[in-house]
Amino acid sequence: MMNDIIADALTRIRNAAMRRLEVATLLHSNTVVGVLNVLLQKEYIAGFKVIDGQNNKKTIQVELKYDDNEKSVINEITRVSKPGRRVYKSASEIKNFKNGYGTIIVSTNKGVIANDEAYAANVGGEVLCTVW
């Protein structure tokens, strides 16, 4: 049984990017879909689609994005808040990451959003992961 589906999804994306695969297959979760929406909005991935599988088990296929040199657009993707150690930050604490080159993905009462949106809306929340 898997305890942290978000960490599993991030690891699958990281491993697929290291192998230069075009598509990574993830397990479905509404939170994972929220994280992928932020990654798509910030142009870290090319796209994703939810696929219905057998026995009502859904999967997600993520199209990874690479630059002209066939290097992954995602340099590093790291899980921050974990089931054993939750990390919460206020809006002022998540204002900037990697001098604006990176993104913090935050789960708030307004949904899963990026750090710049959370700062603009003046909401904090659980820091799910960081990407740059």
Swiss-Prot record:
Q: What NCBIfam families does the record point to?
A: PRK00136.1 (NF001109)
GO terms for biological process? translation
Q: Which one Pfam family would you cite for this protein? A: Ribosomal_S8
Q: Where is the signal peptide?
A: none
**Which cysteines share a disulfide bond?**
none
What is this protein called in UniProt?
Small ribosomal subunit protein uS8
Q: What does this protein do?
A: One of the primary rRNA binding proteins, it binds directly to 16S rRNA central domain where it helps coordinate assembly of the platform of the 30S subunit.
What keywords sit in the KW lines? Ribonucleoprotein, Ribosomal protein, RNA-binding, rRNA-binding
Domain of life here?
Bacteria
Q: Which GO terms describe its cellular component?
A: ribonucleoprotein complex; ribosome
Originating organism: Aliarcobacter butzleri (strain RM4018) (Arcobacter butzleri)
